Amino acid sequence: MTSAINEYFDQAQLSMAAYAAGLVVEMNMGENRDAYEDALRGGGMSNAQATRFAAEYSIVSTTYIDISGLAVNVFRDNETGQIVLAIRGTNDVLDILSNAELYFGGITRPQTVSLYNYVQRLLTPAGQLAPQVIDAPPYSGTGSGIYAAPAVLGLGYLSGASGVTVTGHSLGGHLSAVASRLFPSLIQSTYTYNAPGFNLPVADALLDQFPGDAGAFPSNITNVVADTGVTVISNVGDLPGTPKRIFIEDQSLITNFPGNHGIAPLTDALAIYNLFATIDPTGTIERVTEILKASATTDKKTLETALDSLRTLFQENYAFGSP
């Protein structure tokens, strides 16, 4: 039995995998598997995480990066066939500029346009023309400026697809919510991790200009946020959906940038939540959080102490505090 907590952990790992660069379909097989795992480690995964992830997920399309800074990886769950769009968060100067636009303008326009255009290419069969748009003057209102652009050849990787999951951390989570708004017939589930929100009137005014079946943000967006210390970015704007607050070990912004905002501390914490949920699928986030907070007197040892306690209960001949 899979619980919601198990799913939050799985999607956190996929959000981390969005930071892997240079993925190509050929990495799924043979000797190229090592390159796949190396790319995942470059995105922040541990050796064990990378090996397990590469065994569980296949690469659907080459890593997409464009001039706006948008970066997307597309994966397929080898067991269920589930397709996942994993959108990268802030990673370079272009993303920093997009973040600045988001904070002051309520939504990141260039990457929103790039995301729409890329998904249209994924949906359009290879060899056929995919509709594209451009954001250009003259602007007649707060969110206008979206016009038809010359069509380009489709990629076809998601031709005929539905029930797709989209996930992302930080700016990637913000864009995941955008994808769910622009492509409601394609996207079934949306997960965001420490993602900034929107100035909703400004965002709606922009997104309403896009062609297609865009209507409103869905209500089933799941927003997973670190509930420890200072997490400024996830408090920006309004993010539609349901927040899920996860207790993490408090991170130093100086010695472990970007501190509590990073995807790694959140994924590490969710690994412990996932372990508890695997033992008891009826457990809730709130209950696991209570256990973790009671596990140690210092945030720095909370996860280790909780894991040691479980090992003491379930692992034969385990001495508390052993590696």
Predicted regions and their residues:
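Flexible, membrane-associating and regulatory peripheral segments of lipid-active enzymes
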Residues: 1-87, 285, 289-290, 294, ...
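A conserved cap/lid and substrate-binding interface adjacent to the catalytic center
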Residues: 37-164, 182-189, 194, 198-200, ...
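Conserved short loop/turn motifs at secondary-structure junctions
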Residues: 29-31, 163-167
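Short, solvent-exposed loop/turn elements at domain surfaces
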Residues: 23-25, 93-94, 231-234
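Gly/Ala-rich beta-loop-alpha elbow adjacent to hydrolase catalytic centers
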Residues: 167-172, 176
